[in-house]
Amino acid sequence: MSQDLQKEVASRKTFAIISHPDAGKTTITEQLLLFGGVIRSAGTVKGKKSGKFATSDWMEIEKQRGISVTSSVMQFDYNGSRINILDTPGHSDFSEDTYRTLMAVDSAVMVIDAAKGIEAQTLKLFKVCRMRGIPIFTFINKMDRQGKMPLELLAELEEVLGIESYPMNWPIGMGKELAGIYDRYHRVIEQYRSEEDERFLPLGEDGDLKEVHAIQKSLYYDQALEEIMLLDEAGNDFSRERIIAGEQTPVFFGSALTNFGVETFLRTFVDFAPSPSSHESNEGVIEADNPKFSGFIFKIQANMNPAHRDRIAFIRICSGEFERGMNVTLTRTGKSMKLANSTQFMADDRETVNRAVAGDIIGLYDTGNYQIGDTITNGSKKLEFEKLPQFTPELFMRVYAKNVMKQKHFHKGVEQLVQEGAIQLFKTWRTEEYIIGAVGQLQFEVFEHRMRGEYNSEIRMEPIGKKIARWVKEEDADEKLSTARSMLVKDRFDQPLFLFENEFAINWFNDKNPDIELTSLL
């Protein structure tokens, strides 16, 4: 790999933003795009009344409900770095999509609501980041409102998540009393709601302001200085190595809604976030600077442009250089393909991409060739990157087309949304009626909404009273083993499994069939 290409790869910062719903994840994404010069004004995310919607919320249902249910990809340049942001679903029903997204990034930004602290979904996503060993940067949001005390939030981070924290800055007051943040890294105080020329006040060697300023009259100024002294003496030492290893999280305070502390966060993040790292494969570790092009598909999204009914497969480039028109092998099928139609996303615009390098995320127009988890490369034809996680669904519904004359629309919609990973598909063992599986109820709502809006197919869904899926070996697939509390079905790859009513039904099955092994996904 040439030095120029190595330099390009090193400039890539590819990260996901994770949070519990309503912590302000999409708002912070908007502000980052603002600093990247991609959008002129940040949309109000919950803008049902104003009619303004978040740049990263693609789908109609997202706009209506003010939540992200798909992961969007956005790219911009900032201070010599090429930033690739993946905005992930905050809602727990879409955790599978989020988990796959976390396989495609080199670091994560965890957004926490200062009033609520660590919430269930944050904890879940944090654990995946830890499992992958990727660095985690923490942004404690909504400091313009009353919330938990900063020291309490740090203690919660360390106790609940089991990770060292190092505050890069520290708030001076909060809510109505928020006066600014003390930036330990840049040695300045950033004022809240100040004139531009007064925004940053330099600190002296003693840690206090170089010149007397009105902010020192704030009720919370002296308290902030005392807390910083405490952190200097008794807090964790800053360690770049521990950050990269995912063992220490740099903590930033701010307010995404009022755009306070966000640019300071971005500037510091770019300094410390890792460049593209290596990926595990069946042929050993593939380094980002390997000259052969390789990548994997972590997401498929249909109908991003309803006018064109298009389907885009998102690929994380793991090594080498992508050039439009290049020939690659789809290793799952061994098929050779020409990558002629490719795109990149800049907020709500998309543009054809002619070249990209390791660390970049590009979209390939898909006519049905790709599946989530596919590897493409112009190197070894047997290369496969590690498998992407798949969850065992916990809710199941039979699904039918209301209008039998529109079966074609119905089948196309189900097939495409299943390929996208929006829902999981099962079929009854003999009659092959459709049963769909989801991790949470909202997935069914989105499925129904998209079938109607994107595929012109009205559907009927009926609960089947089964909640637990367990796979069996093909030789154990015997319909006689089905009971009122268990049902033999097959998945989309024709692998047999039983759907059980509850744990009691599983225990009963195990007692009766001790030689049959039941397995689950994640």
Curated annotation (Swiss-Prot):
Main subcellular location: cytoplasm
Binding site for GTP: 19-26, 87-91, 141-144
Keywords: Cytoplasm, GTP-binding, Nucleotide-binding, Protein biosynthesis
Localization annotation: Cytoplasm
UniProt record, GO biological process: regulation of translational termination
Domain tr-type G, first and last residues per copy: 10-277
GO cellular component, one term: cytosol
PROSITE patterns: G_TR_1 (PS00301), G_TR_2 (PS51722)
GO molecular function: GTP binding; GTPase activity; translation release factor activity, codon nonspecific; translation release factor activity, codon specific
Domain of life (superkingdom): Bacteria
One Pfam family in the UniProt entry: GTP_EFTU
Annotated family: Belongs to the TRAFAC class translation factor GTPase superfamily. Classic translation factor GTPase family. PrfC subfamily.
Function, as annotated: Increases the formation of ribosomal termination complexes and stimulates activities of RF-1 and RF-2. It binds guanine nucleotides and has strong preference for UGA stop codons. It may interact directly with the ribosome. The stimulation of RF-1 and RF-2 is significantly reduced by GTP and GDP, but not by GMP.
HAMAP family assigned: Rel_fac_3
Record's protein name: Peptide chain release factor 3
Species this protein is from: Listeria innocua serovar 6a (strain ATCC BAA-680 / CLIP 11262)
